Swiss-Prot record:
GO terms for cellular component: extracellular region. Keywords: Carbohydrate metabolism, Glycoprotein, Hydrolase, Polysaccharide degradation, Secreted, Serine esterase, Signal, Xylan degradation. It comes from Neurospora crassa (strain ATCC 24698 / 74-OR23-1A / CBS 708.71 / DSM 1257 / FGSC 987). This is Feruloyl esterase B. Belongs to the carbohydrate esterase 1 (CE1) family. Feruloyl esterase type B subfamily. InterPro entries: AB_hydrolase_fold, Esterase_phb, Plant_Biomass_Hydrol_Est. One of its GO terms (molecular function) is feruloyl esterase activity. Glycans are attached at N88, N117, N179, N245. GO terms for biological process: cell wall macromolecule catabolic process; xylan catabolic process. Involved in degradation of plant cell walls. Hydrolyzes of the feruloyl-arabinose ester bond in arabinoxylans as well as the feruloyl-galactose and feruloyl-arabinose ester bonds in pectin. It comes from the Eukaryota. It catalyses: feruloyl-polysaccharide + H2O = ferulate + polysaccharide. It is found in: Secreted.
Length: 292
């Protein structure tokens, strides 16, 4: 089997594709000096969907671009990928920042929304099909984006993250922070967690993003309890109750945790899976409605 890099070069040569990750400047409001990269496939769909992909602590936008198979799916299905990057706080997202946790107040979240708006305008993208995903700190920020800007995102997928506002009030949100209460499984009632979401955008009564939560049961950096707390939060916000567990889905090591009929909220907990849970592009993109 050809290594992935060689296979990609072979496919590029065969098809004449030349799309690549590109840095974008001057996209709009950027209160925390974050960076924007995009991957726009050569064969762009009419009114393309957008996925915002958020890297983990210590990562970068280019490293996360290389970290999943999303670019190859973008080539096949014609959607756009936005890769934000943060140079702040050991390259960790500001999930503790009151501005990021509040609709329209600033922080990383406002800069990311500005990237989305820029991309929609530039490529005539479909504003009703904007999605967000991320790993570790990016998974935490995925929950923040879905909670703080629900009108922007149709659905999200958080890998190895924590509930929205779990790090609220902490001095920082890195693996080196002295306060690791959140990452060790801070607990609230579903209603308390739900109120953190509702209070991030007071008065909002519109639809809320559908969510997937992925986590490893052997994660000793961001404890598995964090995923269960995130599921409690979104079950309250989305108004769906736990319905069943399904063993061996999407693969043998995992248990699928289904809420309601599974169309709004699903969790995946992996036995023997550490930090971070691997990205399952196919399951995620099916949930988003971007592939069959």
């Amino acid at each position: 089997m050809l290594p992935r890099t060689l296979l990609g070069l072979a496919l590029t040569a065969a098809t004449g594709l030349c799309a690549s990750l590109q840095q974008v400047t001057n996209w709009g409001s950027n209160p925390t000096n974050i960076r924007m990269y995009t991957y726009v496939p050569d064969k762009l769909a009419t009114k393309p969907a957008i996925i915002v992909a958020l890297h983990g602590c210590g990562g970068t936008a280019p490293s996360w671009y290389s970290g999943t198979r999303l670019p190859s799916y973008a080539d096949q299905y014609g959607f756009i990928l936005i890769y934000p990057g943060t140079p702040n706080m050991s390259n960790c997202w500001g999930v503790n920042d009151p501005a990021s946790l509040t609709h329209g107040a600033g922080g990383d979240s406002l800069g990311i929304v500005a990237m989305v708006n820029y991309t929609i305008a530039k490529y005539n993208a479909d504003a009703s099909r904007v999605y967000v995903m991320g790993t570790s700190s990016g998974g935490m920020m995925t929950n923040v984006m879905a909670a703080t800007y629900p009108e922007v995102f149709e659905a999200g997928a958080a890998y190895s993250g924590v509930a929205h506002a779990c790090f609220a009030g902490a001095a920082s949100a890195t693996p080196f922070s002295p306060n690791q209460t959140c990452a060790r499984g801070l607990q609230h009632t579903p209603e308390e967690w739900g109120n953190f979401v509702r209070n991030s955008y007071p008065g909002y009564t519109g639809r809320r993003p559908r969510m997937q939560i992925y986590h490893g049961l052997a994660d000793n950096l961001v404890y598995p309890r964090c995923a269960m707390e995130a599921l409690k939060q979104w079950s309250n916000v989305l108004g769906v109750e736990f319905s069943r567990n399904v063993s061996g889905v999407p693969s043998q090591a995992y248990t699928q945790i289904v809420y309601g009929d599974g169309s709004k909220l699903v969790g995946y907990m992996g036995a023997g899976v550490g930090h971070v849970a691997p990205t399952n592009e196919q399951v995620m993109l099916k949930f988003f409605g971007l592939i069959n």
